[in-house]
From Swiss-Prot:
Database matches in PANTHER family: MITOCHONDRIAL RIBOSOME RECYCLING FACTOR PSEUDO 1, RIBOSOME RECYCLING FACTOR
Domain of life, per lineage: Bacteria
Pfam families: RRF
Keyword Protein biosynthesis: yes
Subcellular location: Cytoplasm
UniProt-recorded name of the protein: Ribosome-recycling factor
Family designation: Belongs to the RRF family.
HAMAP family: RRF
Keywords linked to the UniProt accession: Cytoplasm, Protein biosynthesis
GO molecular function: ribosomal large subunit binding
Length: 183
């Protein structure tokens, strides 16, 4: 049987992973500035195998609205361009022979609202994950043997305190991204 400290440490670690997943999901959402992270989920079909774009090319941002993709092998230019076009990012790659340029258009108000809505959904998914972890931890606390009711109540209160801390981090992460999107 686990003790209170290990239950709390496990809950904290798992809630931390929920925050990492949220940050990863939010990094893909486009803001008004060029960010190589928006291409993170673009998968390139290259010589019969699929791999993330950052494994076949370097991605740089020379200015606030341009991404430059330089493949390590010129043979990857076509597949990279196709993968970007086929993604649901709404980007238009421009092949210059040895590099691909992507000029990011200004976000329309409607697109910004859609992005905020997506960010809100990711944040809600993270909140649900944190609450599920809390429920699991509280169940584990109640199963601990050889401790009194007071100790169980303290353990439950500590799990709730950890949960509140991580929910606040979810909210903070969401609001930061919302401000980025709305500019």
């Amino acid at each position: 049987m686990a003790d209170m400290k290990s239950i709390q440490a496990d809950a904290r670690e798992r809630m931390g992973k929920a925050i990492e997943a949220l940050e990863s999901n939010l990094s893909v959402l486009r803001t008004g500035r060029a960010n190589p992270g928006i291409l993170k989920k673009v998968i390139v079909d290259y010589y019969g195998s699929t791999m993330p774009i950052d494994q076949v090319a370097s991605i740089t941002t020379p200015d606030a609205r341009t991404l430059v993709i330089t493949p390590w092998d010129r043979g990857a230019l076509g597949p990279i361009e196709k993968a970007i076009r086929d993604s649901d990012l709404g980007l238009n790659p421009n092949n210059k022979g040895d590099t691909i340029f992507i000029s990011l258009p200004m976000l329309t108000e409607e697109r910004r609202k859609d992005l905020v809505k997506n960010a809100k959904n990711y944040a809600e998914d993270a909140r649900i994950a944190v609450r599920n972890i809390r429920k699991h931890a509280l169940d584990e606390v109640k199963k601990v043997e050889g401790v009194g009711d007071d100790e169980i109540k303290r353990g439950e209160a500590e799990v709730q305190k950890i949960t509140d801390e991580f929910i606040a981090r979810v909210d903070s992460t969401f609001h930061k991204k919302e401000q980025e999107i709305l500019g």
